[in-house]
């Protein structure tokens, strides 16, 4: 049996990011062969990762990457917010965004199969799950393309807690597009303009507003006028271009972009963990532990 030295253990740890005992066990198992030790850890990592699939990954980071006229926005989840500060995790999220922009996959299955330096996006996620010790999952992505006379705007809030990707037609000024992306991160509009709002959503809101006005005891002829005004306000609140621009509330987003020769074409906003139901027992345990202190 080959001697396993502290130097060998350190080298393997540097290569893989695993703990000291795991590195030593791997080297002993393969009799000091460094390449086989790496393979052993990755193989065992895949087995460990598979056992973590029942965990809920509701934290993490979102990111945006642009490659020429193609951009990608991605969300990669972890189990705890602490991992979002991990350099390996941050690099993984950036790499995934870049690879998705370069390859333009149409489905998550295609995205997972994209080749990377170490293997595929899927195998990189499994390796990260093993090394970091938390379930790491690639939740979603969107690929967006633009014309030559358009600009991408990318903005990350809180280091990637919120990511926004915008497309502004008619100008190549990326600062304008970024300003709009910043506005979207802060205000969270749901549509670019009124025409995108589904009719059933408007009908539902109209019914609610009508009931509100009637409950206020207003006469029928006044109710109709009130509902028209309130419905218009509702549409402006959820449609991006009609909102007061955060950096200059005296003008709307539409007027700001138009003053730069552009027009908002589209946007995508990812907020990490939105729509994922977190386990309540984690929060309860946290509260109980604080009460004991």
UniProtKB/Swiss-Prot annotation:
GO molecular function: translation elongation factor activity
GO cellular component, one term: cytoplasm
The keyword Protein biosynthesis appears for this protein: yes
Localization annotation: Cytoplasm
Pfam families in the record: EF_TS
InterPro entries in the cross-refs: EF-Ts_dimer_sf, Transl_elong_EFTs/EF1B, Transl_elong_EFTs/EF1B_dimer, Transl_elong_Ts_CS, UBA-like_sf
Chief location category: cytoplasm
Keyword Metal-binding: no
PROSITE patterns xrefs: EF_TS_1 (PS01126), EF_TS_2 (PS01127)
Chain segments carrying region Involved in Mg(2+) ion dislocation from EF-Tu: 80-83
Keywords, sorted A to Z: Cytoplasm, Elongation factor, Protein biosynthesis
CDD domains named among the record's database cross-references: UBA_EF-Ts
Domain of life: Bacteria
Family, per entry: Belongs to the EF-Ts family.
Function comment: Associates with the EF-Tu.GDP complex and induces the exchange of GDP to GTP. It remains bound to the aminoacyl-tRNA.EF-Tu.GTP complex up to the GTP hydrolysis stage on the ribosome.
Protein name (record): Elongation factor Ts
Organism of origin: Enterococcus faecalis (strain ATCC 700802 / V583)
């Amino acid at each position: 049996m080959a001697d396993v030295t502290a130097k060998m253990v350190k080298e393997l740890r540097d290569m893989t990011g695993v703990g000291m005992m795991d590195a030593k066990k791997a080297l002993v198992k393969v009799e000091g062969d460094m390449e086989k030790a790496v393979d052993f850890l990755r193989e065992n990592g895949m087995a460990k990762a598979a056992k973590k699939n029942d965990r809920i990954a509701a934290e993490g980071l979102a990111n945006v990457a642009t490659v020429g006229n193609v951009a990608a926005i991605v969300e990669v989840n972890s189990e705890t917010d602490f991992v979002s500060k991990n350099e390996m995790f941050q690099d993984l999220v950036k790499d995934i965004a870049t690879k998705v922009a370069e390859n333009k996959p149409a489905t998550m299955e295609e995205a997972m199969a994209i080749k990377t330096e170490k293997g595929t996006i899927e195998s990189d996620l499994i390796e990260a799950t093993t090394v970091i010790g938390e379930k790491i999952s690639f939740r979603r992505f969107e690929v967006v393309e633009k014309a030559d006379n358009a600009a991408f705007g990318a903005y990350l809030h809180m280091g990637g807690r919120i990511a926004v990707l915008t497309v502004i037609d008619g100008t190549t000024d990326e600062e304008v597009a970024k300003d709009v992306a910043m506005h979207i991160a802060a205000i969270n509009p749901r549509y670019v303009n009124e025409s995108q709002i589904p009719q059933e959503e408007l009908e539902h809101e109209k019914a609610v507003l009508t009931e509100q006005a009637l409950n206020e005891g207003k006469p029928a002829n006044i109710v109709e006028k009130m509902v028209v005004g309130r419905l218009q306000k509702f549409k402006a609140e959820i449609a991006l271009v009609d909102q007061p621009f955060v950096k200059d509330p005296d003008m709307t987003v539409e007027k700001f972009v138009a003053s730069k020769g552009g027009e908002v074409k589209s946007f995508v906003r990812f907020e990490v963990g939105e729509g994922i139901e977190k386990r309540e027992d984690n929060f309860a345990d946290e509260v109980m532990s604080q009460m004991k202190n």
